[in-house]
Amino acid sequence: MKNALKSSFWKDCKNFLDQNHIAYFVDAIDGDMAEHSASIDGDVLETFRKYCLYGGLSNFKNLWLYANGLFDNKAEKAAPPEKYSWAGIYDPGAESRFQKTLSDFEAAHPYGDRPVLGLLFYRDEWIWDDTAYVNAFLEEAEKEGYAVLPVFANGFIDESAGMPSLSEVLETY
């Protein structure tokens, strides 16, 4: 997104939006690179950012409901941004699709004497249930006699939001 926000196309779009007093918000992985119109006040901007940062279908649905509610008092009310785990062990059989602790995961999936493979993948793939390749890896590794510890975490770490560093994730799991 960094490069897109520096493009002449975006600059032209931004000028058009500003000249016509059209509010806009552009999220970016690097929070300092995000852009928004001056007409969006701090509380609204913070709520937009939380919906985007926390991710997932319900947060994006509620982002649009929230934005709509800013202009229509009769609109469906948005739920507040919902925080999901920043990191965990993927467990497709669990109700939440993850385990928070290694001991919980080991209780649900005893390794026995099998060698354990670690698999680290992006949190967004877990949030959006985009885990087909992870599931295929689990299935194939188990066929070959391995146990797998599939851990998800953020690729871009914002410790101010409470995200653990990659080192912390690896030490924890």
Question: Which ranges hold each PLM region?
Answer:
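An N-terminal assembly and electron-transfer interface module characteristic of large anaerobic redox
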Residues: 1-173
